[in-house]
Amino acid sequence: MDLVNDLILRAARGEPTPRPPVWFMRQAGRYQKAYRKLRERYTLPEIVQNPEVCAEVTLLPVKALGVDAAILFADITTPLYGMGVDLSLVENKGPVIHNPVRDEKGVEALRPLVPEEAVPFVLETIRILKRELPVPLIGFAGAPFTLASYLVEGGPSRRFLRVKALMYGEEALWHRLMEKLTEAMARYLRAQAEAGADLLQVFDSWVGALSPADYRRYVKPHMERLFQSLRPVGVPVIHFGVGTMGLLEDMKEAGGDVLGLDHHTPLPWARALLGATPVQGNLDPAVLLAPKGVIRREVQRILKENGGKSGHIFNLGHGIVPETPEENVRYVVELIQEVAA
């Protein structure tokens, strides 16, 4: 289907738009009644590996909310299966790695990712969506550090002690792990763009655990290589992290056309720091649990803080939480659409 709404593509290029485009991280998920009904029939991996069902889930928020972009429904760990990682997605916990990568043997056991063989269902989902979507489709992948944190820790972590111990104690091995993950995610993202994704987002959800000095030494060179490898595909790339206020300058230098801001980052400060670089964000997801008067106030605050500057994509500072009322998400879209009314 031809796009009837390219607002997000224009905003990602820093071009003027009549209003900010709006979409939400985790806009397809457990807060939706229709999604919960599907989950009664399918597990998360079953949805992701069934292109027709996965496309249906991806389309849910486009139809129900009127957002300006769809994001492919998947998990950031999805491509790791194709690298030989034994993992399970545990409800209310997240990915659990049954063969953690903590030594040279574990790193060398990671297979090169061949997307067409390892995740053909992801690429077929994209092709289905491109026939049906009136808005741009965002493909995505986890950033190397965030994926490494899962692989080394064995699952979600609060303190990242194992991953930091490897990083500090075995630097050469750390860089070998990051090189493998960087190459794999570059292939995965390029394959998504070639299948039809209009934009890409790189999620570095846990990189805020690092200091700026550690980011520059242990992560930034790999992110630079990742973004350089994506330039030939010619689609805008969003670079997002959580807790990254102290890393924004380095993240900008590492690459990406748009920088995603979490809700702890003051928007006026970030726009001054980043200059002409487009930004995405940054409503606190918890605001969506509040009364509509509070939601309106906070949405208007963010719009005012942006000051009408080009290159702003309205989003949350992290993903929608499952407890969120659907009508509150729809209300945010209506508030943004009022800007152009």
From Swiss-Prot:
Catalytic activity: uroporphyrinogen III + 4 H(+) = coproporphyrinogen III + 4 CO2
Domain of life: Bacteria
Record-annotated site: Transition state stabilizer: 75
Example of a GO cellular component annotation carried by this entry: cytosol
One Pfam family from the record: URO-D
Family annotation (InterPro entries): UROD/MetE-like_sf, Uroporphyrinogen_deCO2ase_HemE, Uroporphyrinogen_deCOase
Uppermost EC category: lyase
Subcellular location: Cytoplasm
Gene Ontology molecular function, alphabetical: uroporphyrinogen decarboxylase activity
CDD domains: URO-D
Classification via Gene3D superfamilies: 3.20.20.210
Residues holding substrate: 26-30, 75, 150, 205, 318
GO BP: protoporphyrinogen IX biosynthetic process
Keywords attached to this entry: Cytoplasm, Decarboxylase, Lyase, Porphyrin biosynthesis
Pathway the protein contributes to: Porphyrin-containing compound metabolism; protoporphyrin-IX biosynthesis; coproporphyrinogen-III from 5-aminolevulinate: step 4/4
EC code: 4.1.1.37
Role: Catalyzes the decarboxylation of four acetate groups of uroporphyrinogen-III to yield coproporphyrinogen-III.
HAMAP family xref list: URO_D
The protein's assembly and partners: Homodimer.
Name this polypeptide is given: Uroporphyrinogen decarboxylase
Species whose genome carries this gene: Thermus thermophilus (strain ATCC 27634 / DSM 579 / HB8)
Gene that encodes the chain: hemE
